[in-house]
Amino acid sequence: MPDPTQNPNVTPELEQHAAPEAAAEAAPESSADVMPSLEETLRQAELKAAEHYDAWLRAKAEGENIRRRAQEDIAKATKFAAEKFASAMVPVKDSLEAALAVENQTVEKLREGVELTLKQLVSAFEGAGLAEENPLGQKFDPNKHQAISAIEAEGEPNTVINVLQKGYLLHERVVRPALVVVSKAKAQ
């Protein structure tokens, strides 16, 4: 026989949900214990959020400082990029001025002075990574050479047979293409 005190409409799930509510009503002092714990948890979360915000602000400022320093370094590098080359060119100018200052100069002495000055200039070019391009006898390369004319000649077509003006490369980049005359096949 069913228990007359038990409600037949109450399922075990409803009893489980009702149990915590009944326990909360039965023990009001335990809810007071729970509230300070929630307040303490909230306070700790707010402190942690403030710490994270402060760390984020510091990281953001550091990132901006790094970016600013990098821009300053780039500006300085751009401004003084030619400093090494310029300092290598000063002795060349000094040599030319000294040659012009001598009044009674023989042609041989003048030639010697010009040759020494040319050596200084070539050394300065090499120090700066500027290389001379003299393509005589090489296959024509439109990336490095500028053909002024093409003439019939013996040998393989598209070969440089005369260099009118040397070219220059700065670290493998063309600064000035060589002006050349290129061979073409003889007409049959």
UniProtKB/Swiss-Prot annotation:
Low complexity compositional bias, start-end: 19-32
Biased segments, Polar residues type: 1-10
InterPro entries, A to Z: GrpE, GrpE_coiled_coil, GrpE_head
Signal peptide: none
An example Gene Ontology CC term for this record: cytosol
Highest rank taxon of the organism: Bacteria
Keyword terms: Chaperone, Cytoplasm, Stress response
GO annotation terms (biological process): protein folding
Chief location category: cytoplasm
Region Disordered, annotated ranges: 1-35
An annotated Gene Ontology molecular function: protein-folding chaperone binding
Subcellular location as annotated: Cytoplasm
Binding partners and assembly: Homodimer.
Family (UniProt): Belongs to the GrpE family.
Job description of the protein: Participates actively in the response to hyperosmotic and heat shock by preventing the aggregation of stress-denatured proteins, in association with DnaK and GrpE. It is the nucleotide exchange factor for DnaK and may function as a thermosensor. Unfolded proteins bind initially to DnaJ; upon interaction with the DnaJ-bound protein, DnaK hydrolyzes its bound ATP, resulting in the formation of a stable complex. GrpE releases ADP from DnaK; ATP binding to DnaK triggers the release of the substrate protein, thus completing the reaction cycle.
NCBIfam families on file: PRK14139.1, PRK14140.1, PRK14150.1
Protein name listed in UniProt: Protein GrpE
Originating species: Azoarcus sp. (strain BH72)
